[in-house]
C-alpha cells in the first residue's frame, strides 16, 4: 500500500551558490556520514559532479520528507536520511537515529530515484507499507 509520494527538483546552480556562501558547511548540515564520504570523494575527483551529488541528495531528503508527510520535522532531519547506492547503482535509503525507529515502527519502506542533468537535480520517493 502506498503511504505517500514526494518529488523535489532544484537548480544545481542555486545549491552551488549556497554551498559557496557557507564555505562548504551546507554539505556538513545536509549529508549523513556515509553520504559525506561519497561526496568528498566525488568532489575531489570532479567538482561539478560532487556538487551534482550534493544536489541529488538534497532533493532526495526534500522528496522523502514530503512522502512521509512530516516535512523537515522530527524524526526527519537532514542527516537522518541517507541515499546510498547498491553496487548496481540503484539508489537505496538508509535511516539513522529516530528516523530509523520511526520507519521500523510504522513498518514503512521508501523507494527512491534521483537524477541530475546539466543544471537540474530531481528526486522522487514512494513510501509504502512493507
Curated annotation (Swiss-Prot):
Mg(2+) binds at residues 8, 62. The gene is acpS. GO terms for cellular component: cytoplasm. It comes from Polynucleobacter asymbioticus (strain DSM 18221 / CIP 109841 / QLW-P1DMWA-1). It comes from the Bacteria. HAMAP family: AcpS. Belongs to the P-Pant transferase superfamily. AcpS family. Transfers the 4'-phosphopantetheine moiety from coenzyme A to a Ser of acyl-carrier-protein. This is Holo-[acyl-carrier-protein] synthase.
Amino acid at each position: 500500500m502506498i503511504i505517500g509520494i514526494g518529488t523535489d527538483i532544484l537548480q544545481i546552480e542555486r545549491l552551488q551558490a549556497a554551498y559557496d556562501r557557507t564555505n562548504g558547511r551546507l554539505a556538513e548540515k545536509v549529508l549523513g556520514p556515509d553520504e559525506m564520504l561519497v561526496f568528498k570523494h566525488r568532489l575531489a575527483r570532479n567538482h561539478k559532479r560532487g556538487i551534482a551529488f550534493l544536489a541529488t541528495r538534497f532533493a532526495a531528503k526534500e522528496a522523502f520528507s514530503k512522502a512521509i508527510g512530516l516535512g523537515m520535522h522530527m524524526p526527519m532531519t537532514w542527516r537522518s536520511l541517507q541515499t546510498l547506492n547498491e553496487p548496481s547503482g540503484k539508489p537505496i535509503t538508509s535511516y539513522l537515529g529516530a528516523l530509523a525507529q520511526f520507519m521500523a515502527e510504522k513498518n514503512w519502506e521508501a523507494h527512491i530515484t534521483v537524477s541530475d542533468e546539466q543544471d537540474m537535480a530531481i528526486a522522487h520517493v514512494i513510501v509504502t507499507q512493507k
